[in-house]
UniProtKB/Swiss-Prot annotation:
It is found in: Cell inner membrane. It catalyses: di-trans,octa-cis-undecaprenyl diphospho-N-acetyl-alpha-D-muramoyl-L-alanyl-D-glutamyl-meso-2,6-diaminopimeloyl-D-alanyl-D-alanine + UDP-N-acetyl-alpha-D-glucosamine = di-trans,octa-cis-undecaprenyl diphospho-[N-acetyl-alpha-D-glucosaminyl-(1->4)]-N-acetyl-alpha-D-muramoyl-L-alanyl-D-glutamyl-meso-2,6-diaminopimeloyl-D-alanyl-D-alanine + UDP + H(+). Keywords: Cell cycle, Cell division, Cell inner membrane, Cell membrane, Cell shape, Cell wall biogenesis/degradation, Glycosyltransferase, Membrane, Peptidoglycan synthesis, Transferase. Cell wall formation. Catalyzes the transfer of a GlcNAc subunit on undecaprenyl-pyrophosphoryl-MurNAc-pentapeptide (lipid intermediate I) to form undecaprenyl-pyrophosphoryl-MurNAc-(pentapeptide)GlcNAc (lipid intermediate II). It comes from Prochlorococcus marinus (strain MIT 9312). It comes from the Bacteria. GO terms for cellular component: plasma membrane. GO terms for molecular function: UDP-N-acetyl-D-glucosamine:N-acetylmuramoyl-L-alanyl-D-glutamyl-meso-2,6-diaminopimelyl-D-alanyl-D-alanine-diphosphoundecaprenol 4-beta-N-acetylglucosaminlytransferase activity; undecaprenyldiphospho-muramoylpentapeptide beta-N-acetylglucosaminyltransferase activity. Gene3D superfamilies: Glycogen Phosphorylase B. UDP-N-acetyl-alpha-D-glucosamine binds at residues 14-16, 122, 163, 190, 285. One of its GO terms (biological process) is cell wall organization. This is UDP-N-acetylglucosamine--N-acetylmuramyl-(pentapeptide) pyrophosphoryl-undecaprenol N-acetylglucosamine transferase. Pathway: Cell wall biogenesis; peptidoglycan biosynthesis. Its EC number is 2.4.1.227.
Amino acid sequence: MSKKNNLLVAASGTGGHIFPALAVSKEVEDEWNIHWLGVRQRLDANFIPKKYNLRTLNIKTPRKNIFLFYQYIEILISTFQIIRILKEKKINLVFTTGGYISAPTIVASKLLRIPIIIHESNVIPGMVTKYFGFLCNYVLLGFKKTNSYLKNCKTIFTGTPLREQFYKFNFLPEWVPKGRGPLLIVMGGSQGAKAINQILYESLEFLIKKQFRIVHIIGESNQQPFHVKNSKNYIQKKFTNEIAALIQNCDLVISRSGAGTINELIEAEKPSILIPYPDSKNNHQEKNALILAESGGSVLINQNKISKEVFEETLERIFKIKSKKGKNHYEILDLMKKNMENNNKIKSNNEIKKFINYFLKEF
């Protein structure tokens, strides 16, 4: 048996960085020894399997202005730490998905002449891709539109890798509320979304009265549980590993619009109400949401426009019953479903595996 080469996966922070990297790691783990580099006090340790040899560095949250002198000093210190790790683990290739850890990892790898692949999931590239992408051998894109923002990079459209369960059908978990009412999945990403949680709490009485069934994923942040009378149709969880099953089997998703969520909705062909995170860098969540809103598969509501009244009116419009040939159906929801079916799907995991394994020929 030939000796495996060593792949360093640098991904940290939110699920939007971690989950695509996990999907790729699982896809290539038979050909590579996986070593994972993350940041202390982030979500990393909760999600990274022990077999991926997680190492963490103490990297602070980047300031808004990437050109601040002391921020470069922090990157420089981290770069030397990563150089030591790259040498120690005899890394042959680096794959990163952005986040705090990516910039010093790219610089360190370039100094050691180790090939680098970065994946950019968002329509608008993040700061690391924008300012350090030209140092990478390839910049893999989740959306074709992103190419126009990266003129000095070698870009290839691959789509965004998803967790394997999204590529197969999953049955609805037993703990989901039973009944005939429409099933809503409400979530705010891996860290939660206070604004989405709040608007749902305000509208719970309306939702229960209308016989909606609700699964509410509040996120890993310190959200207080919310209790409501007669809540058999409402279930709240901080996190679930069964998110693919929930999205595949629900009627509508209400969520932020991170790149991972957008691609999960495309794969599941699921209609949605998207409420972009207003403070995302370069307003990238709104640009992501527009991909689905412009196709007619989603309703986009900016956070500064959302209210109890707007939220409830939007749901009433989507779930307004129309009669056709003696049968009742949700005309708007059905149209949104049809529009979601028209979005192009690509199994990105396989595409990215091809590029990673291409480098095996070089060693």
